[in-house]
Swiss-Prot record:
The lineage of its organism: Viruses, Monodnaviria, Shotokuvirae, Cossaviricota, Papovaviricetes. InterPro entries: E6, E6_sf. Keywords: Activator, DNA-binding, Early protein, Host cytoplasm, Host nucleus, Host-virus interaction, Inhibition of host innate immune response by virus, Metal-binding, Modulation of host cell apoptosis by virus, Transcription, Transcription regulation, Viral immunoevasion, Zinc, Zinc-finger. This is Protein E6. The keyword Plastid does not apply. It comes from Pygmy chimpanzee papillomavirus type 1. Belongs to the low risk human alphapapillomavirus family. The cancer-causing human papillomavirus E6 protein has a unique carboxy terminal PDZ domain containing substrate but low risk E6s do not possess this domain. Coiled coil: none annotated. It is found in: Host cytoplasm; Host nucleus. It comes from the Viruses. Forms homodimers. Interacts with ubiquitin-protein ligase UBE3A/E6-AP; this interaction stimulates UBE3A ubiquitin activity. Interacts with host TP53 and EP300; this interaction inhibits TP53 activity.
Length: 150
């Protein structure tokens, strides 16, 4: 990607594309961790997950799918506070879990209400990482469960 305007206030892929007059499928942006160019699918996934771009040296960076998952695992090991059921989470934050943003701890996608409800119905715990509550999205739930099923 050509050097973006250093005065840009873009925080998301969508904002960056609008400010630089680019279409999302033609955007070439590097991963902040491994420096590889994100594929078109990864660019769209990054936007879908409502993640913010990172600015370094007046250049925008995102994160590829592989590095997002690795970073999720690293955060689990380095910043694990504790795990709790939805009732405990709600008591701690004084809000319904349906009223707060909870991201997947692996892929970082914000959980929808159905994914939060699944935690409740299946009595799965949310985990607190670095003072933020996290859970599992449907995609990561399935991949986690594949390892324990016969």
């Amino acid at each position: 990607m050509e050097k973006a305007n250093a005065s840009t206030s873009a925080k998301t892929i969508d904002q960056l594309c609008k400010e630089c007059n680019l279409c999302m499928h033609s955007l070439q942006i590097l991963c902040v961790f491994c420096r590889k160019t994100l594929s078109t699918a990864e660019v769209y996934a990054f936007q879908y997950k409502d993640l913010n771009i990172v600015w370094q040296g007046n250049f925008p960076f995102a994160a590829c799918a592989c590095c997002l998952e690795i970073q999720g695992k690293v955060n689990q090991y380095r910043h694990f506070d504790f795990a709790a059921y939805a009732v405990t989470v709600e008591e701690e934050i004084n809000k319904s879990i349906f009223d707060v943003r909870i991201r997947c701890y692996l892929c970082h996608k914000p959980l929808c209400d159905v994914e939060k409800l699944r935690h409740i119905l299946e009595k799965a715990r949310f985990i607190k990482l670095n003072c933020e509550w996290k859970g599992r999205c449907f995609h990561c739930w399935t991949s986690c469960m594949e390892n324990i099923l016969p």
